[in-house]
C-alpha cells in the first residue's frame, strides 16, 4: 500500500497489479489488538475501509459482496432459520441476512470489535440491523466459536473473512471446516468468500479440497464483479453436506422477495450457477 495527498494505492504481489483511489484525506485510524484499521474519504467511491493496508470495502461497491455472500445461500436452503456469520465485522452481511423475514436467529462472531465500531461510525448504512432482536454480536475467535458450536444446530454458516492471512488464516483449513460440518444440520450449507477466480483458482481448489476432507460433498463457486478487489472479480464458494446437491434454489421466493437488493436477483442467481468454462475446467465441474 502507498498513499500520498491524493491517492490510496494497493499493490497485489500475487497478481502483479495495483488499484488506486483518489482520496481527499484520512478520516480515522485505530490500532486494535489484532490489526490497523483506517478510514479514508475518496472523491468518487465514498469512504474506504482499509485493514493492515488492504482495502476491505468502499461505500460505492460493497453491496455486490454483501449480497452475494448471503442471498445465494439463504435462497438455496429450503427453510433457513438459524444463521452463523464468522467474521463480517462491518455488519453489511448481517444486514442482508436479516432482510429475510423467516430468519429467527443470527449469531455474528468477529475477532475484532474495533471493525464493528468503525463501521458503526463511518458506514452506518451497513449497521442498520445491529440492534435487531434476532441478532447476537460476539467479539471473539471464530475458530474457537465454531469448535464449541452445538452439533446439528445451524442452517447456514457464512464465513465473511479477510484474506487467508493474519487473524483469518485459521478459517481456511480442515479443522475449521470440520467444526462447521459438525455444527450444520444435515441440509445445512456453508458459504465462504473465496478470493479472485481469475487470479487465485489454486486457492479455491485448495479450499474445496480442505472442505472435502472435512466431509463436505458438493461445491459451487459463484463469481461476481467487485471493482475494489484484485482483478475486479471475486467469488464465494457454497458447500453442502449432501453428495447429490445440485444447488437448486427457491426461484419463486427469490423472484418475489419482500426486500430490495441492488445486484442480486433470481435471474442473476440462475446464471451464476453456470460457471465460465475456464472455472468449470479448473474446478472439474
Curated annotation (Swiss-Prot):
It comes from the Bacteria. Disulfide bonds: none annotated. Transmembrane segments: none annotated. S-methyl-5'-thioadenosine binds at residues 35, 110, 141-142, 167. Coiled coil: none annotated. Its EC number is 2.5.1.16. Keywords: Cytoplasm, Polyamine biosynthesis, Spermidine biosynthesis, Transferase. Belongs to the spermidine/spermine synthase family. Homodimer or homotetramer. This is Polyamine aminopropyltransferase.
